[in-house]
Amino acid sequence: MGPCSRLFVCFLLWGSTELCSPQPFWDDETERFRPSKPPAVMVECQEAQLVVTVDKDLFGTGKLIRPADLTLGPDNCEPLASADTDGVVRFAVGLHECGNILQVTDNALVYSTFLLHNPRPAGNLSILRTNRAEVPIECHYPRQGNVSSWAIQPTWVPFRTTVFSEEKLVFSLRLMEENWSAEKMTPTFQLGDRAHLQAQVHTGSHVPLRLFVDHCVASLTPDWSTSPYHTIVDFHGCLVDGLTDASSAFKAPRPRPEILQFTVDVFRFANDSRNMIYITCHLKVTPVDRVPDQLNKACSFSKSSNRWSPVEGPTDICRCCSKGRCGISGRSMRLSHREGRPVPRSRRHVTEEADVTVGPLIFLRKMNDRGVEGPTSSPPLVMLGLGLATVMTLTLAAIVLGLTGRLRAASHPVCPVSASQ
């Protein structure tokens, strides 16, 4: 571009000094390494608050804004008091103050707000020299981890896992098919069948845990403190239902530490016509590297060997099942049927144990069991039987009369009349 052309462009772009000023042929090293100017708005996301620092030269034009024209968030929080000589304006607010919005994502907690510059006329003037501006602000905090800058003392598991242990443990008790491959779709049984139960805890990101069935009770309603009731598991994991004529037992080995499977021979309560039961179990967990003991065990009774045996752990932890005293009395969640309410247990985390219920289990009577119930046939069945017998009698009578008429007709034949011989 020649001098004339350059001068012509300068007139068109009057005030564009960058284009019209002469450019040196050398490279100024001091300009290259000069530190860049800090941003006009800086945000510091602290543990419990956010600190916003605003340069009074917000627009970079050299014209300073007034602190009174700045607010933070939907609640229009005002800045901290500062001297007129300060070159910055500061805000310091809590994460849940000033109308800050919290959003929860898969990996982070996001607190969002905005810085508002809303200029107002100064004095009696009705003019503005700066524009209205809104600057969005966000603070991201990871959901997994410690946001404090102070060192933490480790608990029995890492800090991150302790939080999960209080939020992510989900206990369940389900009816399973005989081969344990899937959940049983229909809760119907016949007396003499065997119910396959699977207790499980979903640990999420927790450290590995081992699940135990501490206590189980069968009742006619989901309220396991009502009568009648039948104890299936007692004494911190002793499957006492196997002591009777039943073959109830825990399945060994486990498929996984967080799963415990066991079978119960189905039954119904005598002198009750509902033919259904609910099973409520108290489940709890321990770290998987903890050796089972008398308070945390799964023991079954073998009639062939006449002794108790654990699913895992030392054999002697099941000896207390025969005595009915395992560990310190009152430590387990046991039902006080006299008082009709559960006895509370002292525990460190509420979510390390839970009460879960499955049911109703519905029992269908077998066809050959009707005669065993005694002479209690219902009147509709009697009337139906009499009606069928009457119909069959009338049908046989009609058949006999029809055959008799045909035999008489055959003994006296009628000859057809011929037109001519």
Swiss-Prot record:
Disulfide bonds join 45-139, 77-98, 216-281, 238-299. Its main location: membrane. Keywords: Cell membrane, Cleavage on pair of basic residues, Disulfide bond, Extracellular matrix, Fertilization, Glycoprotein, Membrane, Pyrrolidone carboxylic acid, Receptor, Secreted, Signal, Transmembrane, Transmembrane helix. Residues 23-381 are extracellular. One of its GO terms (cellular component) is extracellular space. Residues 347-421 form a propeptide. GO terms for biological process: binding of sperm to zona pellucida; blastocyst formation; egg coat formation; humoral immune response mediated by circulating immunoglobulin; negative regulation of DNA-templated transcription; oocyte development; positive regulation of acrosomal vesicle exocytosis; positive regulation of acrosome reaction. The keyword DNA-binding does not apply. Residues 403-421 are cytoplasmic. Pfam families: Zona_pellucida (PF00100), ZP-N (PF23344). Residues 1-22 form the signal peptide. Gene3D superfamilies: Zona pellucida, ZP-C domain, Zona pellucida, ZP-N domain. It comes from the Eukaryota. One of its GO terms (molecular function) is receptor ligand activity. It is a single-pass type I membrane protein. It is found in: Cell membrane. Glycans are attached at residues 124, 146, 155, 161-162, 179, 271. The chain crosses the membrane at residues 382-402. Belongs to the ZP domain family. ZPC subfamily. Component of the zona pellucida, an extracellular matrix surrounding oocytes which mediates sperm binding, induction of the acrosome reaction and prevents post-fertilization polyspermy. The zona pellucida is composed of 3 to 4 glycoproteins, ZP1, ZP2, ZP3, and ZP4. ZP3 is essential for sperm binding and zona matrix formation. This is Zona pellucida sperm-binding protein 3. It comes from Bos taurus. The lineage of its organism: Eukaryota, Metazoa, Chordata, Craniata, Vertebrata.
